Amino acid sequence: MDMEKTFNLTRRDDGIAILTMDVPGETMNTLRSEFGPEISDVLAEIKADTSIKGLVLVSGKKDSFVAGADISMLDACETATDAKQLSQQGHVVFNELESLPIPVVAAINGACLGGGLELALACHKRVCSLNPKTMMGVPEVQLGLLPGGGGTQRLPRLVGVTTALDMMLTGKQLRPKQALKMGLVDDAVPESILLRTAVEMALAGKRPAKKKHQSFFNKVLEGTSAGRNIIFDQAGKQVAKKTQGNYPAPAKIIDCVRQGMTKGMAKGLEVEASHFADLVMSKESGAMRSVFFATTEMKKETGAGDVEPQKVNKVMVLGGGLMGGGIASVTTTKAKIPARVKDISETGLSNALAYAYKLLDKGVKRRHMTPAVRDNLMALMTTTTEYKGIKDADIVVEAVFEDLALKHQMVKDVERECGEHTIFASNTSSLPIGQIAEAASRPENVIGLHYFSPVEKMPLVEVIAHEKTSAETIATTVAFAKKQGKTPIVVQDGAGFYVNRILALYMNEAAQLLLEGQSVEHLDKALIKFGFPVGPMTLLDEVGIDVGAKISPILEKELGERFKAPTAFDKLLADDRKGRKNGKGFYLYGGKKKAKEVDQTVYSVLGLKPGVDTEATEVAQRCVVQMLNEAVRCLEESIIACPRDGDIGAIFGIGFPPFLGGPFHYIDTLGAANLVKILENYQSRYGSRFEPAAKLKQMAEEGTRFFS
């Protein structure tokens, strides 16, 4: 019996053939190496049939053209030669498609990403639908890779070097009208007439491509080799600054484009295949692909086994501050669920509404939505100063001050005013959920739902189950968080949960280094060089020095002496330094200069004279090993279920460098024995806070790893 085909050819009476890609048994199309012979046979058949006057390439999937190459085939590559052959195989097929003597048109509806866009680029014309799900881009850089199917060569020739580099170096995805404006597609039409438009294009023949939309300045730059060299040099400098040398893919992308534009497409494709192979085998891409697979896996999980989540039709948010406003905003705009915000003051409610409106209005200004859509989404958010209109709330998210008595009162109020099924989800950042649930008559409905600030940008939420939380409550809360566009990790109850617990020791160590004479700039630069998006002092300013001061005593009380924050930091609070929020912290705020400057008076407040500035790798290592050690303790204590969750929590919650794969992947890279040695060295110099976790010592003795 014949296997089901992926590529099916149908001939129309007008001489146009339709080639439909439909991977059997999958919801989305992805490109796989085994498709090579099949598509080559189809192309040979088309070439041999003189009755075919034009070809239109379409997808058989709803709302998806081609989502990219199947990433799992990269893990099957044992050598760089294997990876290079994958790229070269793609080149052969796409070159065959491009060299067909008849017009070839890609009719794009839905996601057209990575290898999918490279397939479309090999066609002579492209038309896309105006479907909101139609997005185009080359996001390979986000996996530590580069477009390996000719994308580094065809994209700059179509849209210009500057635009192509921007797309490839950021991995950004374009909406239909953006793609049309830059010349990536030749037309963007309603989905209902997409096929008809593509057929008409094919019948019209190979007309010269529309001139790409470029500024006069870019035309001058890109029109000469000297101008292009300026573009490449500038891109190289920006990449070096942004990546700190930690990510090899961006520099290789620039080199592919440079070589292709200088020495011709054949040379460019050769360089592309070679660089692609090197990146596939690199530890950085391996780590970033592990993050991709982990998040893909987690999307399928309920957090509570086979238990089905309950439907959430209405949400209430207690507190209209930054967190409350952000939570209500993602509930209405992302999850499209009505949210009612309660605050004791009208000011708080106004702030929550203004917060949501500002975010939606950005979408209008960027033409991502119409004013009518914005207003309809705003209508989903209502406000109250009393417990009115909330009887039917399915989830109540509490986002009030870190005060246990206040949270107890909230629990009692909600149980009195809402239904028996209502879930009480606390956004506490440090208080154990079990302690909050002590005030509940229905503790099985109480759960932690810890968001990170700013809520609309940070992808992670911690779903915290205490010992009496029901499986249904967990499953419903996880499903709700996913609807908000979040990546949830289920963690067990305990002070600081997972993310804030590992972050606290990292921050405390940075504070110790500051008190030893390291400068604020040096500390921040050392950790940025290591791979964090911001340094610890900047982070403390952003989070709030006062917030850190409130959390530390809770962690110290519950978890022990190693969480004790340096007492010298009390002097910062006495000087009314809260960070960015009151314009007074480690850095100066409110000035006209773009670059941040350290507030030099912070040293005198702390009674310090900076000037030690130890070697940057040593500074970073001292902070990072504290985080790694505590992550292992969290696994030991079953705060996190598995190393995978610990990696995702650290990357998405605090910006742990993705190219290292997360704390547990990084420990595997370092080796447990090596990490124990580093910790014991610090323990002998700085004390018991560096004592290695028992599990780490055991792994060092046995020579085991977290991942196979």
Swiss-Prot record:
EC numbers listed for it are 4.2.1.17, 5.1.2.3, 1.1.1.35
Q: Name one GO cellular component term.
A: cytoplasm
Cite a single GO BP annotation. fatty acid beta-oxidation
Record field: transmembrane: none
For region Enoyl-CoA hydratase, the annotated ranges are 1-190
Alphabetically sorted, this entry's keywords are:
Cytoplasm, Fatty acid metabolism, Isomerase, Lipid degradation, Lipid metabolism, Lyase, Multifunctional enzyme, NAD, Oxidoreductase
Q: What residue stretch is flagged as signal peptide?
A: none
Annotated Gene Ontology MF terms?
3-hydroxybutyryl-CoA epimerase activity; enoyl-CoA hydratase activity; long-chain-3-hydroxyacyl-CoA dehydrogenase activity; NAD+ binding
CDD domains on file:
crotonase-like
Which superkingdom is the protein from? Bacteria
Q: Which residues lie within the region annotated 3-hydroxyacyl-CoA dehydrogenase?
A: 310-708
UniProt site positions, description: Important for catalytic activity: E118, E140
Compartments where found: Cytoplasm
Family, similarity comment: In the N-terminal section; belongs to the enoyl-CoA hydratase/isomerase family.
Task: Describe its function.
Answer: Catalyzes the formation of a hydroxyacyl-CoA by addition of water on enoyl-CoA. Also exhibits 3-hydroxyacyl-CoA epimerase and 3-hydroxyacyl-CoA dehydrogenase activities.
Q: What is this protein called?
A: Fatty acid oxidation complex subunit alpha
Name of encoding gene: fadJ
